[in-house]
Amino acid sequence: MLETLYQEALKRKKEPKEGSYTSYLYDKGLDKILKKVGEEATEVVIAAKNDDKNEMANETADLLYHMAVALVETGVSLEEVEAVLQARQGKQSRIHDRPEIDQY
């Protein structure tokens, strides 16, 4: 499904369609697209915090859509993202507690 979402975003970038929300985002540019990514990411956090599975699914879908648009707009392919994920798979993380911040 992510590939389909990405391909649809790519198609709309190459073939703008009047009245299309995706075309509108591309027309407004990267700042507008990134603003929407930020809004949707925040809504995912709120849905998770509220323990609302339905809202979590809906907001995650919105975030993935806007991320696909952002990837296309910045020229990053889904294959590039997948390559990064593949390279990270199986690597041991250096997880440790960070020191408490006591001065702001």
Curated annotation (Swiss-Prot):
A family per Pfam: PRA-PH
InterPro entries the record matches: HisE (IPR008179), PRib-ATP_PPHydrolase-like (IPR021130)
Official protein name in the record: Phosphoribosyl-ATP pyrophosphatase
GO molecular function: ATP binding; phosphoribosyl-ATP diphosphatase activity
Cysteines joined through disulfide linkages: none
This enzyme's EC code(s): 3.6.1.31
Catalytic reaction(s) noted: 1-(5-phospho-beta-D-ribosyl)-ATP + H2O = 1-(5-phospho-beta-D-ribosyl)-5'-AMP + diphosphate + H(+)
GO BP annotations listed: L-histidine biosynthetic process
Family: Belongs to the PRA-PH family.
Lineage of producing organism: Bacteria, Bacillati, Bacillota, Bacilli, Lactobacillales
Protein species of origin: Streptococcus gordonii (strain Challis / ATCC 35105 / BCRC 15272 / CH1 / DL1 / V288)
Keyword annotations from UniProtKB, A to Z: Amino-acid biosynthesis, ATP-binding, Cytoplasm, Histidine biosynthesis, Hydrolase, Nucleotide-binding
Compartments it resides in: Cytoplasm
Highest taxon of source: Bacteria
Catalytic EC class: hydrolase
